[in-house]
């Protein structure tokens, strides 16, 4: 007779909280990526100021523009290095929706930090508006990733 352990209790998945004003998880994800050195109040301040700037420039709900920007930035495929018989191949893999959103937010913030001049909330708002219009450095990063995956399509069988 074999001993079987009782069924393990399933842990609840961590649900990301939403912010106080917009009540949106995407906003919370963005703010948590803006965050540096534990200064969450400053991260919220930067985010809300950029929302205000977006609204002043477009007269459209800034949340819609952020969703559109992140949707256009979300990659469908990416490459992953895999070592096969002594050589490293870049293998294209599909990106899950959650991971794609995380990558899009990361690229958006990296490209907004690289912009010259201005304050962070101005740089962030301009990068978000550019991404929504399918322009900007973050869009180039996405296209570069897709191009890499396309050129390494022959190595897809190594998955």
Curated annotation (Swiss-Prot):
It holds the Pfam family Ribosomal_S7. InterPro entries: Ribosomal_uS7 (IPR000235), Ribosomal_uS7_bac/org-type (IPR005717), Ribosomal_uS7_CS (IPR020606), Ribosomal_uS7_dom (IPR023798), Ribosomal_uS7_dom_sf (IPR036823). SUPFAM superfamilies: Ribosomal protein S7. GO terms for biological process: translation. Keywords: Chloroplast, Plastid, Ribonucleoprotein, Ribosomal protein, RNA-binding, rRNA-binding. The keyword Ribosomal protein applies. CDD domains: uS7_Chloroplast (cd14871). Its main location: plastid. One of its GO terms (cellular component) is chloroplast. Residues 137-159 are annotated as: Disordered. It is found in: Plastid, Chloroplast. Residues 141-150 have a biased composition (Basic and acidic residues). One of its GO terms (molecular function) is structural constituent of ribosome. Part of the 30S ribosomal subunit. Belongs to the universal ribosomal protein uS7 family. One of the primary rRNA binding proteins, it binds directly to 16S rRNA where it nucleates assembly of the head domain of the 30S subunit. This is Small ribosomal subunit protein uS7c. It comes from Sciadopitys verticillata. The gene is rps7.
